[in-house]
């Protein structure tokens, strides 16, 4: 099985360590397929996906179809005669006509311990849900949403203060290692496929900005998990005096008060009452202001005890 012709499909930063691992191993990556360049940031400057940047740095041909399922795109992929397609956070559903092309199928690197957290945002939802362990699963793709046979699993603990960004960075490397192990087993003829138990699954849908609105009637740990799971995007938030207050890092405490009311505001942070305790906001950003540690923010912006955080009026 030496010299497999591999097509890599991926788009964001999460996919880059796996592509780099393939290149470091000397695999024959014949093409990279990624999403089109898109406007990003406040200036809406059109930027290439990170995977495209990495591929071009190594002289690999890049395709950027608007829709990978259209017949002419499928046929252009077929003409490349890949033995294997590796998919990491590509961002489009692959049709059966494409899945059937490579001799050894299409292998996906998914950022959860399947069958838990199928879907687009597994990193966020496992943290929001308060889980203490997650990982990466490689799987043989089928036409369902993350329903294919599992191949290799790598687990890792989730730190109590870890947010989605740091978990993303760690799992991107774990995913690359899991894919390398999967290829070694495939090459040796020792790859074992394990069916997923649909009864054990849960879904991780794409997040929307409004999902980050904090409900102060929840318990401290629930709110902390939401903040961790929403950082860096789409961000947890509340409103203070009609202005959006983005909240990036919090601790839990045992303060008492009406949910959403400010208990104290000082160098240690902004303490806000919730159900069964309180939240100490440690890092925040008020609408129109810079992101700051709470102590630095409060040195120049006074918030009186009794002030209310909540929904926009």
From Swiss-Prot:
Its EC number is 2.1.2.9. The keyword Transferase applies. GO terms for molecular function: methionyl-tRNA formyltransferase activity. It catalyses: L-methionyl-tRNA(fMet) + (6R)-10-formyltetrahydrofolate = N-formyl-L-methionyl-tRNA(fMet) + (6S)-5,6,7,8-tetrahydrofolate + H(+). InterPro entries: Fmt, Formyl_trans_C, Formyl_transf_N, Formyl_transf_N_sf, Formyl_transferase-like_C_sf, Met-tRNA-FMT_C, Met-tRNA-FMT_N. Keywords: Protein biosynthesis, Transferase. Belongs to the Fmt family. Attaches a formyl group to the free amino group of methionyl-tRNA(fMet). The formyl group appears to play a dual role in the initiator identity of N-formylmethionyl-tRNA by promoting its recognition by IF2 and preventing the misappropriation of this tRNA by the elongation apparatus. This is Methionyl-tRNA formyltransferase. The lineage of its organism: Bacteria, Pseudomonadati, Thermodesulfobacteriota, Desulfuromonadia, Geobacterales.
């Amino acid at each position: 099985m030496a010299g497999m012709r591999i097509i890599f499909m991926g788009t964001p930063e999460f996919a880059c360590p796996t592509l780099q691992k393939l290149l470091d191993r000397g695999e024959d990556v014949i093409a990279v397929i990624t999403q089109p360049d898109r406007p990003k940031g406040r200036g809406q400057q059109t930027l290439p996906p990170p995977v495209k940047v990495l591929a071009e740095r190594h002289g690999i041909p890049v395709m950027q179809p608007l829709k990978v399922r259209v017949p002419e795109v499928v046929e252009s992929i077929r003409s490349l005669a890949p033995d294997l397609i590796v998919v990491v956070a590509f961002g489009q559903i692959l049709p059966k006509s494409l899945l059937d092309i490579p001799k050894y199928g299409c292998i996906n690197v998914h950022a959860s311990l399947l069958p838990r957290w199928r879907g687009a945002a597994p990193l966020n939802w496992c943290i929001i849900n308060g889980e203490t362990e997650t990982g990466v699963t490689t799987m043989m793709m089928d036409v369902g949403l993350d329903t294919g046979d599992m191949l290799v699993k790598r687990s890792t603990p989730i730190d109590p203060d870890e947010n989605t960004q740091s978990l993303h960075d760690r799992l991107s490397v774990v995913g690359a290692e899991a894919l390398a192990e999967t290829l070694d087993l495939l090459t040796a003829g020792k790859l074992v496929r394990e069916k997923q138990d649909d009864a054990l699954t849960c879904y991780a849908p794409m997040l929307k900005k409004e999902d980050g609105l904090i409900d102060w009637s929840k318990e401290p740990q629930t709110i902390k998990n939401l903040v961790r799971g929403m950082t860096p995007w789409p961000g947890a938030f509340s409103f203070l005096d009609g202005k959006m207050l983005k909240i990036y890092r919090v601790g839990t405490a045992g303060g008492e008060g009406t949910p959403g009311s400010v208990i104290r505001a000082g160098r240690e942070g902004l303490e806000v009452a919730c159900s069964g305790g309180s939240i100490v906001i440690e890092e925040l950003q008020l609408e129109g202001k810079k992101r700051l540690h709470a102590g630095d923010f409060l040195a120049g912006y006074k918030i009186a005890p009794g002030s209310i955080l909540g929904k926009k009026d």
